[in-house]
A protein has these predicted regions:
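Preference for protein termini
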Residues: 1-202
Length: 202
C-alpha cells in the first residue's frame, strides 16, 4: 500500500517553510474524493466566474445609480477611498480575477458549502507543494505533480516576466510564493514587497 512517510515529508519540506509561523499535521496519503465530487469541483471555476461577472455588473450599475445604492454601499463598506478609486478606474473596471480561491466546507451528506470566495493566489504554492510531494507515491492525485504550478503559470502570457506582489499584511504567504517562483523559474517569476513595489517601465 502506497503512503508518504513522515521522514519523506520532512525531507521534502522547504527549509524556508511554506507559510510563515505555521506548523502542519500531515497525512500519509491524499484526502480521498469521490469521482462525483471531483467532477463538481472541476466545474466550479466556470460557475464562480459567471457569479463574479454578475456581481461586478450589479455593483457597477449601483455605482451609476441604475440600481439601489445599498448594493455598492455594502461592497464598499470599510474600504479606503484610495482603494475604491483604484477599483473603479477604467484600467481594472469589469476585469475578473484570474485566480479564484473558494473556501469550501465538505459536509457528510449535503455536499459542498462555500464560506468565502477570494481572488488572491494565497495557498497556490502550498497546494502545489502538496501535489508535487504526494504525486511521488500517488501519481493519480488530482492535478498531478505539476497541475497547480502549470495552471498558475498559464494565466500569464508566455515569456512575459511576472512579479508576484505580496503586502506586509499578507507576509505569511510570502514563503510559499518564494518557493513557487523558484519552481517556475526565477528568470521569469520574482516575488516583491507591495509597499515598495514600482513597475519597471522596461
Amino acid at each position: 500500500m502506497a503512503m508518504i512517510t513522515p521522514d519523506s515529508l520532512r525531507a521534502a519540506f522547504p527549509s524556508e517553510g511554506l507559510f510563515a509561523d505555521k506548523e502542519w499535521l500531515m497525512s500519509p496519503e491524499p484526502f480521498p474524493l469521490s469521482p462525483s465530487l471531483v467532477r463538481e469541483l472541476e466545474g466550479l471555476g466556470h460557475r464562480l466566474r459567471l457569479f463574479l461577472t454578475a456581481a461586478d455588473a450589479l455593483y457597477a450599475r449601483s455605482v451609476k445609480g441604475r440600481l439601489p445604492e445599498w448594493i455598492a454601499a455594502t461592497v464598499d463598506a470599510g474600504k479606503p477611498a484610495s482603494l475604491l478609486a483604484q477599483s473603479r478606474s477604467g484600467a481594472v473596471r469589469g476585469q475578473i480575477p484570474r485566480v479564484l480561491r473558494p473556501d469550501l466546507l465538505l459536509g457528510d451528506e449535503e455536499g459542498l458549502a462555500m464560506s468565502e470566495l477570494d481572488s488572491v493566489p494565497g495557498g497556490i504554492g502550498l497546494t502545489a507543494w502538496f501535489n508535487q510531494t504526494y504525486a511521488t507515491e500517488f501519481p493519480d492525485v488530482i492535478g498531478g505533480g505539476r497541475g497547480m504550478m502549470d495552471g498558475f503559470s498559464s494565466i500569464f502570457p508566455a515569456g512575459q516576466g511576472v512579479d508576484v506582489v505580496v503586502s506586509l499584511e499578507a507576509a505569511g504567504y510570502r514563503p510559499e510564493m518564494e518557493w513557487l517562483a523558484t519552481q517556475l523559474g526565477r528568470e521569469r517569476f520574482r516575488v516583491c514587497e507591495a509597499e515598495t513595489y514600482a513597475v519597471d517601465p522596461a
